[in-house]
Amino acid sequence: MISYNQWLNNWRYFCRLCERFETCIHFVDDSVDNTGKLINGDTYSIEFCDILMSTSAEFENVTIQICKEIDPNFNDKSNIKALTKTITNKFPKIGETIISSPVQSFSPLRDWAESDEGTIKGIDWWGDHTDIKHQRYPNIKKASFQNCYNALSSLFVMELYASTFVTDGEPVLQISSSPCSYFSSEYLFDLIWPIPKKLPDFEEKDKNKEEL
């Protein structure tokens, strides 16, 4: 089981990554165009490279923790295909999870799935991080503002879902008292969201409880 202390360590690390990202906003404007993409999304740097690599590693770390909760025999050396299959089978509505930033509300994992060809779609930043990991300099342009934004918001979704294993279906309340500095969520209680919503995969469970 994911312990509270383990979850809190994950959450604090995520918040630290968000703080680093938010610091970059002082130098790179985070406005979006009419398609929802960051206008300066192609901007790249060593700092973005570090944030992307750290965020991707943490996404994998938290996702593995969730997979081991779903299946205690899950191999923690599994690749992204196995992670994707396990998560999306257990939580088919995870892609509906909405995350908010100062410039928009969106669903970062909306298209996350395994394609008919066996490739992973919907998290392009993951493939870019892999390219950087194996050959950083030729792929440094993939260490972009947009990839960091997408990776961090995707990690936020996984943090929310991981917290439900600590509290039996409810996001940990302490998230609200230790909020992320850049992203927010309608599934948490705070001044912006005074009445938090249920995570997409837990809405039906609550309806069933009410019927009982």
Predicted features, each with a name:
Residues 17-27, 54, 58-61, 125-128, ...:
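Amphipathic, well-ordered alpha-helical segments in soluble domains
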Residues 45-70, 149-159:
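Short, hydrophobic, well-ordered secondary-structure elements
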Residues 162-212:
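Polyanionic, low-complexity intrinsically disordered segments
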Residues 28-31, 35, 94, 136-139, ...:
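Short secondary-structure junctions and interdomain/linker hinges
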Residues 132-163:
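Charge-enriched, short contiguous segments at helix-coil
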Residues 59-127, 133-138:
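Short non-catalytic regulatory patches outside canonical folded cores
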Residues 1-53, 210:
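Charged alpha-helical initiation segments
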